[in-house]
Amino acid sequence: MFAVIETGGKQYLVKKGSIIKVERLQAEEKEEVEINKVICVSNNGLSCSSNAVVKAEVLEQCRDKKIIIFKKKRRKNYRRKNGHRQYITVLRINEISLQK
């Protein structure tokens, strides 16, 4: 069984036991979160149902790799280098359930 969930403006294809990195969620480590924005669920047949819930456990709150932003204008000696590290939450999917 797999599901497509939406969190942080992005969509993720998940199944039970998978580990994903998402935009930062307001949750503590080892806390269980419910994701209600489920696009579709499949168990050998596709079901676009709005009453599905995905439960996940927060494994870690950390920061992602550094992203480098480099601006340049040729022949003008204009160069700017900047970068940042995005905050992320690492989740383990524990359960995908359809509510009736």
Swiss-Prot record:
<keyword id="KW-0694">RNA-binding</keyword>
<dbReference type="InterPro" id="IPR036164">
    <property type="entry name" value="bL21-like_sf"/>
</dbReference>
<keyword id="KW-0689">Ribosomal protein</keyword>
<dbReference type="GO" id="GO:1990904">
    <property type="term" value="C:ribonucleoprotein complex"/>
</dbReference>
<keyword id="KW-0687">Ribonucleoprotein</keyword>
<comment type="subunit">
    <text>Part of the 50S ribosomal subunit. Contacts protein L20.</text>
</comment>
<dbReference type="GO" id="GO:0006412">
    <property type="term" value="P:translation"/>
</dbReference>
<comment type="similarity">
    <text>Belongs to the bacterial ribosomal protein bL21 family.</text>
</comment>
<dbReference type="GO" id="GO:0019843">
    <property type="term" value="F:rRNA binding"/>
</dbReference>
<keyword id="KW-0699">rRNA-binding</keyword>
<dbReference type="InterPro" id="IPR018258">
    <property type="entry name" value="Ribosomal_bL21_CS"/>
</dbReference>
<protein>
    <recommendedName>
        <fullName>Large ribosomal subunit protein bL21</fullName>
    </recommendedName>
</protein>
<dbReference type="GO" id="GO:0005737">
    <property type="term" value="C:cytoplasm"/>
</dbReference>
<dbReference type="InterPro" id="IPR028909">
    <property type="entry name" value="bL21-like"/>
</dbReference>
<dbReference type="GO" id="GO:0005840">
    <property type="term" value="C:ribosome"/>
</dbReference>
<dbReference type="Pfam" id="PF00829">
    <property type="entry name" value="Ribosomal_L21p"/>
</dbReference>
<comment type="function">
    <text>This protein binds to 23S rRNA in the presence of protein L20.</text>
</comment>
<dbReference type="InterPro" id="IPR001787">
    <property type="entry name" value="Ribosomal_bL21"/>
</dbReference>
<dbReference type="GO" id="GO:0003735">
    <property type="term" value="F:structural constituent of ribosome"/>
</dbReference>
